[in-house]
Amino acid sequence: MIEFDEYKVKLNNIHPKLKELASSLNIEECRVDLDRLHAQIESDGFWDNTDTAQKVTRQASQLEAKIERYEKMCTHWDDLMTICEMAIEENDDSMLDELVEGYKSLEEEMERERLETLLSGEYDGNNAI
């Protein structure tokens, strides 16, 4: 059960990094922008200019994907914490492999998203070295 306690600590330590990632990804701003774009898409005459309509729908799709990736990581974290707490409560070692693999996967997802953020947007013009 010590391993589960260790993973609970690891999960609690990684949670602030998940929140920092939300800030880096501008998730709240993305949600506001997405609401604005959805209102625009639902407005009368939106499809009158197909070029603009395609641009707006593409932008909305990109924002939806970004928000969905972040929310998936949050759900993944919640699920892992639940597994950890259940295993500790029930004294069940059978969930350890799932927890270990899930934690590794979450770390990789977060690192991939962090790197993508660094290599795009406002940081894109910076030198790699």
Give the label of every model feature segment.
Residues 1-128:
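Charged, heptad-repeat coiled-coil alpha-helices that serve as long linker/dimerization "arms"
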